[in-house]
Amino acid sequence: MSTEGFDYEAAIVVVGGGACGLMAAYQAGRRGLDVVLLEKDSRLGCNAEIASGSIPAAPTAHQRRAGVTDSAEQMMGDILRKSGNQADPDIVRALCERSPELIRIFEDELGVAMELNTDAGRYGFSALRLHNGPGRTGAPLIQALRSALAGMGNVTCADRTPGAGLITDGSGAVMGVRAGMRGEQRLGAQRVILACDGFGSNAEMIARYIPEMRGVQSIGVQGNTGDAIRWGMELGAAVAHMSGYQGHGLVCAGYGTRLVPEIPQLGAIIVNRQGERFAREDQGYSEFAREVLAQDGQTAVAIFDQRMVDVVARLDHWKDTVASGAVKSAQSLQELAAAFKLPPEALERSFAQCCGDLPDPFGRARLPAPAEAPFHGAVITGAMVHTQGGLVVDVHARVLRPDGSAIPNLYAGGGSAAGLSGDRPEGYLSGNGLLSAYGLGLIAGEHAAASLLARSH
């Protein structure tokens, strides 16, 4: 395709205005380069904005103050172990080693008050290392990056201007991006960073790569159509882990909200409509989605008590869930069982497995079972949050071909790049998505900028 006749030219064009794209644009912009950020539609939000905003990082000052001993190596081990050793160890190491820097950037450069989540651990974690902004949602992090970019005169943020394809020269090197609803604009670029999300809203790609989730609700934002992955594949890029995804087994059926992951970790009991437990409740919420979807009606009932609610009551996601009406309350377990039409005898047996004399067939850790009135419950189902497969990149976030060579001038991160979770939902460890998004955004923006600045000297 001809490289002449560009409507606009920039040093770097970033496609996608979520966590990865914003961080990439920030890293390149603060180095003084001319950056254009294309965003499909910020009104749709991004997955990082509606998520809990949990960034795993180690070691950090927050951990030290809390008496938590941790390291990048320990964090790397947890991620690789959870992925079944399918994640690329070089990528995992690069992200883990840069993780404390992410927390520092948000605190020291962007003014976000970060905290270490000490309310409850996460399945697969050997130490407390999830760091959050205010209210424990992702919105303050995204807003801080947007505000920072708005103050940079060398960064142009083009909202409601989706990327529509890549422009290459005769050798296959990327030279720019087509943009606009019909691809009517041609933007020249010395470097292009693909920072779109995955393909959770693309029914055709779901049917092809993740058939078990065909027709299952996706709670990610609806603009995730896999565009960047397809563009890369058209240029001969390698892809990996296309069957991988992050599930969520704690979605409040019919309410558009979800229980926070702390609830099962604090000891909630989850039963099917027959009042029977069907899996260990404290497993990862990603793989738990499959367990819930296998039950009658693809639903289950989570039961928890006031002690657990008191721990999470201040969280914005929890407030939204309560406001939605998804949580029912009662002064006794018998009343709560009646409210959800659960057989009381079966429910008693389920409780006995967790805190009584019966052995637990699922091997759950002995957690305090719901015991303090008032008792609470919610009907939950399984859903998909976002896909984990994508373009293969190196430790500098450059997009690679199957032979390991880099496609010239092309970078990828976030949902556009292969994630850290391997081929299955059980490979997902809490925070993998944001670590990959913000981390690869940092790395891509930094490397793309450095490569151009080095060439100019």
Region spans (language model):
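Extreme N-terminal leader/targeting segments of oxidoreductases
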Residues: 1-12, 30, 450-453
